[in-house]
């Protein structure tokens, strides 16, 4: 069994807090804070991608503080430090006075999902963290609702004073779609853009949600009856589980519960409606839908399930390679799609025609292993079992080790970034049969574990490559290592 020797104190504290939060969910920071932190992380990562080496080096200090703040659940302070890093990644010694006065503000909009009959949107700006400077009195906000083509559906301009106390914007009825809310603050010649939000409008939302919930109950009952009778399930377990989880998700949106990220609610509903309507044509539905959107599928094996987010490659007749990506502590199935280089890992895999599967894992690990996930995926996609790859960051790197221990014959390449650990002697030769790429930042608290893993593999005669990245800490290691990671993966699966 994998033996992780030195778990950092900050991670132990985080895991303890997570355990408490399971019992006391109302006593921990809400999903709205997680979502806002993710938006600021994306903004920073986009700037870091374009930054010069000296600018990247200047980001290390605030990033370390941001990670420490995150693990101690001081999310507002983590956001402040990410914004300091964002400023430095842009080569600014000091942001403009206007930016300093508004950068700490958070946009709240409700309802993010409603019927097309809904004619208003409640909007508010409130501090995500406090700033020393205050916005000028003449600050105004421009709001625009844009459809998928970029066409403007509604727009307005309001004084900041009104939005700080919450205001109902009468948008009128909006067409059906997953729209974008674009916001810009302005004072004289100074302006500041807030990251967009998704605003979904669905025709007949209540009726369609009720129908989905009814189908969810039918799928659950059908699965239970057929299992009891040892019959062949007519509803694939993954389809039934996906319908149930989507119905739960949409119900939470209808109740105005905060989510951890932007979700295309209409697209997720329509996927499930297609799965219900087209019955056994699961592969066709997913292939068609997967060409224009990510797929949130709940993979199932018996009663055990795992939430995943999946990116499909372009349609092809040949079976496709599969890349499993495992997020770090505090993340979710959305992490690799929206962070870790603002989603660049997913983009690079898509370029190469690989199916990307990002499973959610909690503090107790994965509820399904890669073998069980592959079985579930084979009912939905044509996959190439001879080209299965694993990539993990931090806690996800430990998950790569765990999957290698459980199913050493499956992965053809393994990547561990910002994590690892010492492995028992009895497991080393099993691990060593697969090529590895292991990396960490010179300023990364996970570096020690990564080096331990690499050295264990080398001592067993394994094929392991290790790389340190200068001026890189724990948060940015995936983004820093993307090019080397994909060169390794592409070369390895082409040789095997």
Q: PLM features: what roles do these ranges have?
A:
Residues 317-318, 365-394, 408-410:
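Gly/Ser-rich "nucleophile elbow"/oxyanion-hole loop immediately N-terminal to the catalytic nucleophile
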Residues 28-63, 100-111, 118, 202-246:
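Amphipathic, heptad-repeat alpha-helical segments
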Residues 315-320, 325-364, 446:
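Short substrate-entry loop that stabilizes the transition state in hydrolases
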Residues 108, 163-168, 172-320:
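A domain-start/cap signature at the N-terminus of enzymes
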Residues 31-99, 323, 391, 474:
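Long, contiguous interaction/targeting segments characteristic
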Residues 413-486:
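The feature captures the conserved acid-bearing segment of alpha/beta-hydrolase catalytic domains
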